[in-house]
Each structure stands twice: as structure tokens, then as C-alpha cells.
């Protein structure tokens, strides 16, 4: 029997390693003078050079990165929400299920992200706050578009974006377009559920409001899920989404209170008091009420 001498692949590995030193590392391409690299594909030069602290305080970088990454996640949320709305509008629900699940998981990610910002203490935030001016997350056009697509509409919220016509156009379109939930209600009407006509065609700039005929339609779905499985699953995807959205809002409130207490927000709002009022917003009222009425 021949003597065992280490790994049977050691010779090949050694040879490959020698070759790798000359041509790459473990077969990896090392020269990108003529090819697209990882950083090129992701536009990292632009992304990583977009942080410009205005104060000398060390902690401002955290504040900037926290909000910039949130905006990137919101960009993906909007990408998915718009596509989900189009799928529902086209009576094609399975693709919407995947998209809505992804949005919920993004919101879960953003809930956890508040834990990073919460490492900023009140004195640390106070040192950089004067440099923020009147800038505030309240002015995020992407967040406002998300709220409008989910049905929480308010025409007064267009004004903070009037100075940027390209942003105003996006938010205004979301205000005037049926929300994701509106399209679900219209789908139920197309499928024969007795939904009031003024829920199918209405002033889309108005926020979602509870309607008894819509709850009755959802109750029919929930009382016989097997007969209406797609709509039943859609309803649960909506509840998952709003559940995650509520947690995101709640962690926003608690993080702000932890860092600034009840001071007014930089954008002029009442800060924590304003954010607490937003916790009372219900996006899909019939889907929550039916849980009591079942």
C-alpha cells in the first residue's frame, strides 16, 4: 500500500496556485483594463463619492449613509410596488405575490437599520444638527410616492417637492393614479364581487377609506379561501406588507425619541408627536376589520 502523503489534490493545487500567481487568483480574472469590473457595474465611484458631511463631527457620516441606503431600498420598493400594481391591474396575481413579499422583506431590513442609527447619542446628534438646516426625511419624494401608491394620499404633500419639477411629477402621478389597493378592489369587482361603484371609479387623489361593501367582498374571500385562493393570498400579502410598514414607522418613532426626545423636527414638524400620529394610519382598513368580524 502506498504511503498517504497529505491531500490527494495538493499537487494539482500547487500547480494551479503557481499559475494563479501569474494569471489570477484561483482562476479569477485580475485585469479589468478592457472589461467591466464589479465597481464599474455598480457605479461605485458615484455612490461612494456621494457622502459630503457638512460638519466636522465624526458621526455625521453615519447619518448620511443611513439615509442614503434607505433611499436606495425605497427605490427598489417603488420598482416592486409599481410592477405589483400593474400585475394586479392585468389580473395576473402570482407575480404580484413575489413582488409584495420582496417589499415586506425590504421593510424588515429597514426596521433593523434603525438599530444602527440608534447608536447615535443625543450629544452626538446635537453636534451635527445645526448643519442640517431645514432638510428632513419628511421631504423624501420617494417615501411620499410609496405612501401614495399604498393609498395614504394627501395633496398637500406635493408642496415640499415643488422646487424640483422632476420629483413633483413622480409624486403627482402617484397621487392621481389608483393605488395598489384600489387596483385590488377593482379586480374584485371584475371577478364578480358586489363592490360599490364609487369604489371602482372615484377621485383617486383621495386616501383609502373604509367601505362596507369592500369588507363584505373580502369576508366572502376569507370565509371560503379555497374558492378564492388567489384573492385570499393577495389579502394576506397586503396584511404582511402593512404589518412590516407599521414596524418600520414604529422604529422610526422610537429612534427619533431616543435621539432628540420631543424637540421639533428639522423640517418644522412636531417631531415625535407627528410621527406618533402617523402610526394611526391604516392602509388596508377592510382587511384588518374583517379579522374581528369573521
From Swiss-Prot:
GO molecular function: heme binding; metal ion binding; tryptophan 2,3-dioxygenase activity
GO biological-process terms attached to the record: L-tryptophan catabolic process to acetyl-CoA; L-tryptophan catabolic process to kynurenine
Pfam families, per database record: Trp_dioxygenase
Cofactor binding notes: Binds 1 heme group per subunit.
Pathway: Amino-acid degradation; L-tryptophan degradation via kynurenine pathway; L-kynurenine from L-tryptophan: step 1/2
Chain sites annotated for binding heme: 252
EC number of this enzyme: 1.13.11.11
Reactions the enzyme catalyzes: L-tryptophan + O2 = N-formyl-L-kynurenine
Keywords: Dioxygenase, Heme, Iron, Metal-binding, Oxidoreductase, Tryptophan catabolism
Cofactor annotation: heme
Annotated InterPro entries: Trp/Indoleamine_2_3_dOase-like, Trp_2-3-dOase_bac, Trp_2_3_dOase
Binding site for substrate: 63-67, 125, 129, 266
Segments for region (Disordered): 1-20
NCBIfam families: trp_2_3_diox
Family: Belongs to the tryptophan 2,3-dioxygenase family.
Function: Heme-dependent dioxygenase that catalyzes the oxidative cleavage of the L-tryptophan (L-Trp) pyrrole ring and converts L-tryptophan to N-formyl-L-kynurenine. Catalyzes the oxidative cleavage of the indole moiety.
Subunit field text: Homotetramer.
Record-given protein name: Tryptophan 2,3-dioxygenase
